[in-house]
């Protein structure tokens, strides 16, 4: 080597040595406060002093600094490198004068192959509606939108470089020199990518980039140290080879293929996934690990791990979930080399070895129901109650682990749910309270509004996808389409600004302290936009497991929407009648009889097809031949149970058709129904026992919710006890049985009888049966469990039960506030506000921690039949008689004009004393009656300390037939009139079956609910008759509707059931004349008897009737129908047709129309 060159090299070495000494002598100044550092070279750290900050708030500030969008913000977290600790989003940093914390802002939640360049792993994307539609239609389309925005990709690239160089992502281990050489070349290839990216991003010339930049800055420190140990000539050769390769790469590959910065980043990061170990994975090394499972026959069993759970590690991986394995020995090769072969084949073998490296999958994120943290111990619960318990070395590590699983759950399963209250982000908690979504895109907001019915004033709240301090309110507005002359929905977006002062609608001046207060203010205003006026009416809050662009999807995890099972798709195992033996009668279900039974073993030839090797005790639910009309609904229940496979649901063996009977064959569960089991116990059941039952039930319902399946009748009598757990060994074990006959085929009376288990919306319309109905039922069942199987509302009549819902009453809840809150969240009258079953399980565990004391006897519920005078708001008079009047009122206890309309009957002041007994009698009668063709009793309202009373009834806005028929004559045909007649007869037949006679049946007292339904009203003259007498003698001197009365009523003042039949004949005459005043019964009879008044009217009327004169045949009335009317007007009561025969005759006529 020439002397000059040697001297020059010597000077360079001296300069390096001086710089190194100077760096060693430099003492950094001690930092104060809290600093957040970034990996982007041009981004200065954030500094915070004396205050309290949550990790989530700090992450928002960091995201703003790095221009990361709100959509990608939840991929990041704060990391303290010196402690190797990630902080949970709700962690509070208390910064004082003595605080010195250095944090790094890092992407924590990572999904390998997010770039989609690997042909081996499933691609990752954000969900889109087009993807959702393609799944529904089984079409193959392009995947959804990219996971990362541009700023997140830039940051991940910088973070990836930092991790690669510092060894935070160590390269995969090697065994041979050849493998080591291959790794070394790949690392130099990474340096080529990094230097090229550096040159292009800084507008430096690509040619000669290697001469200006040393490759040593872009390879791992460990490799640098290895190269330094080699001789000088080897280092020179490596440097020259690298420069030549870099120049060739830049001059040919980059320029010829038009490769940009994005391509370089993706190639760098995708290579990092295969070159290193641990990218996208976090590994925890607990002091102790337990994995347990639960079975029916025995308590929870710990899976054999050995070493008492020590020596194990747990991995959390974004694309698969949670796994565990035994720690590998220090000298054991865990992940072997990436083979030298073709790229795809090599990657496949490498990935296979990674999968085969001893990891046992515990759970994917969608299988997790909740997480519990106690000190340093974290317990993860799956839907099947299998658990993993990690005992970590300190609590911060436990919180970090829980926050990691919780974060991945929100990214892959439900963006608006948290698994653990100890690490719940405050933003998620507040969003749930406010009914606000995360930063979903406009496409999903509009899609949701369409699903909700596109009602005007319906709106969706969502955080902005681009700005951190704005909430977007997307509202449905109705606009007239001038071309088609029809109203069409339009979707308008309004910005709500958030700031330290509160919330305000963008463009206005007034801030409100909370979002809820702002919305309450806006709902009272008339809003305008683009010449449209509208009012906010209903918010559409986030729903469990909603699909949106907030969710990260892979092909393996792609959700398959559950469709309602079609009749042709009904599926269950068939059992031959010879294979079952029917035993003793166990009781009755809804339209079924229940028997004990035996399922015989099948022949040897059938064993391989699911036969039974020995006799099995079963329960037989028999739908008799008299209910063949609901056989299909019965089979639907069986098909639903056949699709369920959960250890806390009863097993359905199959269905047997025996002659004309259909039989559901279910497993026999030892201790029978839960309600009876609880009532049988002589010693009080412990709170822990009750909570275990509640958790098991909620886990089964969570499983059904994930499968988009509705049970339909959750109650304690449909929960079976398989293990009593009274000896303290493992606790109870329950199974949810089938719901029986679906409510969709039950009568209204049967549905009302199921109050308070049936959800209120299902009482209104059984078509409203959804998963939300099961949540209401669970709330009621939890009440039963708390109170040892007591029956809620057991003393209430059907009308009172219905009123309980109409008044939106609640069951009396236990003293424990948290337990009461859980029940009311399940039993809110708005189905959209009910909790996700995962949230129910989580909250049960939280309440259980408090070990609440539950008093055995519940308090009395609020009586829904008692109305408070101050909440009755009169709207108008409906009618007036001699002694009383009826008013239309709104009962509005909330004072928000949302209360129901009711008809209020009261006595006139001058008649109160003498007529109060009659009004009380009418109240007592109405309380006893419940029929779809009789006006419903709602309650009473006491005034003046009880001296005055009001009768509250349902309001029917169409009025009486006397008013309705003349008004709608053009739209009402003979068939409709026949239908009305049938309904009146059905109501009167029911009245007679309860030993009542109406005494005032007329068109004026038949009210119209809708064009297809009428109801009998005004029971002011109704009397009760004794079974052995059959009639009632009137002793008072009330004004009577004489022209509707039968002769025996006019002559002897005796009233029979047949007397009501006479009045019905007159009423039918009114219907056929459409209540024309010119030919009303009074007008016709007055023409027959001539001018008269007082008692003489009754005398002359009796004479005309005794002569056989009757009302004439109305126009368009057939002879057959008129003959039926004449049979109602037989002179002697015994000869008159009865209501049952009238119903049959009308049904026959209807069939012939």
Curated annotation (Swiss-Prot):
Domain Protein kinase: 580-846, 872-1150
Catalytic activity line of the entry: L-tyrosyl-[protein] + ATP = O-phospho-L-tyrosyl-[protein] + ADP + H(+)
Membrane topology summary: Peripheral membrane protein
Residues annotated as domain FERM: 32-416
Any single GO BP term: cytokine-mediated signaling pathway
Nucleotide-binding recorded as keyword: yes
SUPFAM superfamilies (alphabetical): PH domain-like, Protein kinase-like (PK-like), Second domain of FERM, SH2 domain
Gene3D superfamilies, A to Z: Phosphorylase Kinase, domain 1, SH2 domain, Transferase(Phosphotransferase) domain 1
Cofactor binding mode and count: Mn(2+) was used in the in vitro kinase assay but Mg(2+) is likely to be the in vivo cofactor.
Chief localization: membrane
Family: Belongs to the protein kinase superfamily. Tyr protein kinase family. JAK subfamily.
Protein name from the UniProt record: Tyrosine-protein kinase JAK1
UniProt organism field: Danio rerio (Zebrafish)
